[in-house]
């Protein structure tokens, strides 16, 4: 019996089920070495007779493996595409690409976009060059619009002075602020993040240095580690943090004697208590003195700015490096000296704040004064005090009064 040579060496024959989107189904028997393109031609010849007269018909269709949802590559064989016997294939016509727009259409679209584009400053000035100027004072009115966060600092400075005077009249003020001062001491000296401290000591740093580094860097392990490495050879690295000065110690020592000897009817005792309260106020403010972000200081100094200028910029901009850089490159306003200036006490805004009953009651609360001091040096803590049941109503009234007067 005569057998064709290609039949002898032919590969395994697979029976494949082919489907179309129109619902036609049939079986195709193909050797496993058949290319996907040849299989596609056979499928098109079966379902669309005469379609192969157009050579583009094959390229406009694709075969998809139904199980894996994979589009088969024309140049690969059935074996290379890992098609098995009895697999189902889907013959689909490819989506025609959108026609390219004509040049006239492109020009019309660009012209339409240009017509709808908002005019820039130069175009406005050119179009209005021949018009008479009117309402030129509007620029001044707009310039006088005040930002709440900018004015809040001035308001707080002035309110702190008022609160200090009111609290100085309270015979229990010294005792109240001694307790508040002790709370600040506890926060600074006793509350050290144990986990952060353990991480640094496990790296080999002495505990005393690790504690100092954490306090200087707001309990940030990364910044504390950088500080320890940078100051490893510093002879003053083991020096204690600035604490009580001799005058402060004497003031506290005098406090106990003043409590024992001074009474409400003693004028001399009242003066001593007032001086002691002033010292406590100064001590509280010193404890909240500004500490610049060391990484921001280094980054800005590398740009060529002087260290003092960098510290001033960070203080004015609440340790925000980008804002500090803009301040250094700009007109440098507000100046660091402006931060300690209060609002005009005769202004309608400040008078309206002082006349508010909620504010008046809050100014007699030592916690309000501590909140004002904290927000003065740490503006990011404003949200915390806004949510506090004692200080929140005071801050809310200040905000409402400011917004009301700022709109008039």
Curated annotation (Swiss-Prot):
Residues 356-395 form the STI1 domain. Residues 14-98 form the Ubiquitin-like domain. The lineage of its organism: Eukaryota, Metazoa, Chordata, Craniata, Vertebrata. PANTHER family: UBIQUITIN-ASSOCIATED DOMAIN-CONTAINING PROTEIN 1. The gene is UBAC1. GO terms for molecular function: polyubiquitin modification-dependent protein binding; proteasome binding. InterPro entries: STI1_HS-bd, UBA, UBA-like_sf, UBA1_UBAC1, UBA2_UBAC1, UBAC1, Ubiquitin-like_dom, Ubiquitin-like_domsf. The keyword Cytoplasm applies. Residues 245-268 have a biased composition (Low complexity). Non-catalytic component of the KPC complex, a E3 ubiquitin-protein ligase complex that mediates polyubiquitination of target proteins, such as CDKN1B and NFKB1. Within the KPC complex, UBAC1 acts as an adapter that promotes the transfer of target proteins that have been polyubiquitinated by RNF123/KPC1 to the 26S proteasome. Keywords: Cytoplasm, Repeat, Ubl conjugation pathway. It comes from Gallus gallus (Chicken). GO terms for cellular component: cytoplasm; ubiquitin ligase complex. Residues 100-119, 235-275 are annotated as: Disordered. The keyword Cytoplasm applies. Pathway: Protein modification; protein ubiquitination. This is Ubiquitin-associated domain-containing protein 1. It holds the Pfam family UBL_UBAC1. Residues 185-231, 291-331 form the UBA domain. Residues 108-119 have a biased composition (Basic and acidic residues). Its main location: cytoplasm. The UBA domains recognize and bind polyubiquitinated proteins. Component of the KPC complex. It is found in: Cytoplasm. GO terms for biological process: protein maturation; protein ubiquitination.
